[in-house]
UniProtKB/Swiss-Prot annotation:
InterPro entries linked to this entry: Mit_carrier, Mitochondrial_sb/sol_carrier, Mt_carrier_dom_sf, SLC25A33/36-like
Superkingdom field: Eukaryota
Entry similarity comment: Belongs to the mitochondrial carrier (TC 2.A.29) family.
Residue ranges of Solcar repeats: 4-110, 118-205, 226-310
Pfam family name, one: Mito_carr
Record has Protease as a keyword: no
Keywords tagged on the record: Membrane, Mitochondrion, Mitochondrion inner membrane, Repeat, Transmembrane, Transmembrane helix, Transport
The protein's name: Solute carrier family 25 member 36
Compartment(s) where it occurs, according to its Swiss-Prot or TrEMBL record: Mitochondrion inner membrane
Entries under PANTHER family matching the protein: MITOCHONDRIAL CARRIER PROTEIN RIM2, SOLUTE CARRIER FAMILY 25 MEMBER 36
Topology in the lipid bilayer: Multi-pass membrane protein
A GO term from the CC aspect: mitochondrion
Length: 313
């Protein structure tokens, strides 16, 4: 791959990630709050003892739904809070996606000379290498973004800035504090691999269908519109499947990035979540995550493909 091609994929990946992050930021904030332990509701219930008739007070842990969480944020913190962490998100998403797509494209090109071109092995290894590279280089940015999104303040209260967050993390945990949750992110590479394998498979089928069908009679703009919609559908379908399978790592990662020392490692957090909150806690925020990720991934992937097409064309 030439230097120009690498720069094209870097730029296209950055554009796709930035556009998707801006449009879906409010859903990202709601999802992060739902994944954390800070929004658990404690409902007091009075039960009558069947033996002596005395009343017994029991406290039940309940996870609020996406709409309830959204309502709480709007009531207590105001609409601006739905864009908390957007700064670090934009700072991180462009280089993260740029690094990811450049690493993916370079790795895929090299592996095509070793394995069958565009085979499942090629896409799996390329996606894994790209995910590992991007996670390692950008984890500190995502930790700051998560902390800012979990920083709930009432209307009128001074909000913590990204620089204040960085100083706070460094004072409490040092440099290693910026890499909390990275083990869960590495576990999430499985989601990335599943996503790209399915995406490339659907994309290949669409290209085969396009070649086989008699589309020569259609005008160029109609073909381009059809390609764009096809890529968006491929991205949305593949991301839905991958997220549904590998979602628990997202919850574990958010808990690890919370302040405090209760959650220490990936497997310790996983077992603690199941023991204290049940298996359902591993899928807290999944609905909101899917509602956000499907359009975000569709926008990101289609923007990436369009930018590459325009720059290469």
């Amino acid at each position: 791959m030439s230097q120009r091609d690498t720069l094209v994929h870097l730029f296209a990946g950055g554009c796709g990630g930035t556009v998707g992050a801006i449009l879906t930021c409010p859903l990202e904030v709601v999802k992060t709050r739902l994944q954390s332990s800070s929004v658990t509701l404690y409902i007091s219930e009075v039960h009558l003892n069947t033996v002596n008739g005395a009343s017994v007070n029991r406290v039940t842990r309940v996870s609020p739904g996406p709409l309830h969480c959204l309502k709480m944020i709007l009531q207590k913190e105001g609409p601006r809070s739905l864009f908390r962490g957007l700064g670090p998100n934009l700072v991180g998403v462009a280089p993260s996606r740029a690094i990811y797509f450049a690493a993916y494209s370079n790795c895929k090109e090299k592996l095509n000379n070793i394995f069958n071109p565009d085979s499942t092995q090629v896409h799996m290894i390329s996606a894994g290498v790209a995910g590992f590279t991007a996670i390692t280089m950008t984890n500190p940015i995502w930790l700051v973004k998560t902390r800012l999104q979990l920083d709930a303040r009432n209307r009128g209260e001074k909000r913590m800035s990204a620089f204040e967050c960085v100083r706070k993390v460094y004072r409490s945990d040092g440099i290693k504090g910026f890499y909390r949750g990275m083990s869960a992110s590495y576990a999430g590479i499985s989601e990335t691999v599943i996503h790209f394998v399915i995406y490339e498979s659907i994309k290949r089928k669409l290209l085969e269908h396009k070649t086989a069908s008699a589309m020569d009679s259609e005008d160029e703009s109609a073909k381009e519109a059809s390609d764009f919609v096809g890529m968006m559908m491929a991205a949305a379908t593949s991301k839905t499947c991958a997220t549904s399978i590998a979602y628990p790592h997202e919850v574990v990662r958010t808990r690890l990035r919370e302040e405090g020392t209760k959650y220490r490692s990936f497997f310790q957090t996983l077992s603690l979540l199941v023991r204290e909150e049940g298996y359902g806690s591993l899928y807290r925020g999944l609905t909101t995550h899917l509602v956000r990720q499907i359009p975000n991934t569709a926008i990101m992937m289609s923007t990436y493909e369009v930018v590459v097409y325009l720059l290469d064309g």
